[in-house]
Amino acid sequence: MSRSLRKGPFIDLHLLRKVEKVIKTGDKKPIRTWSRRSTIFPKMIGLTISVHNGKQHIPVFISDEMVGHKLGEFAPTRTYRGHSVDKKIKKRY
């Protein structure tokens, strides 16, 4: 479900402060965050943000195509291992 246009984009204040601090200092270290709900802004382009997926932090390099999307879209939380094989029809020779 998309966000209403009258509400505008959302970013957590603590993440915005970290981004501005990294831009000001020019540090290349990834920013660790648990804020999957924050929208990617143009000022984040070129930064690496480590997004938590519930188990570990996934490093995400921000490019210009990602602007407007949420950080959580790039750190999947579920692993898909495929459907189980039907044990009755293993191999027919």
From Swiss-Prot:
UniProt GO cellular component terms = cytoplasm; small ribosomal subunit
SUPFAM superfamilies attached to this UniProt entry: Ribosomal protein S19 (SSF54570)
One GO molecular function term of this record is: structural constituent of ribosome
Any keyword rRNA-binding?
Answer: yes
Keyword list (alphabetical) reads: Ribonucleoprotein, Ribosomal protein, RNA-binding, rRNA-binding
Q: Which GO terms describe its biological process?
A: ribosomal small subunit assembly; translation
InterPro entries per record? Ribosomal_uS19 (IPR002222), Ribosomal_uS19_bac-type (IPR005732), Ribosomal_uS19_CS (IPR020934), Ribosomal_uS19_SF (IPR023575)
The cross-references to Gene3D superfamilies, in alphabetical order and at most eight, read: 30s Ribosomal Protein S19, Chain A (3.30.860.10)
Signal peptide, first to last residue: none
What's this protein's function?
A: Protein S19 forms a complex with S13 that binds strongly to the 16S ribosomal RNA.
Q: Which family does it belong to?
A: Belongs to the universal ribosomal protein uS19 family.
This protein's name: Small ribosomal subunit protein uS19
**Lineage, highest ranks first:** Bacteria, Pseudomonadati, Pseudomonadota, Gammaproteobacteria, Enterobacterales
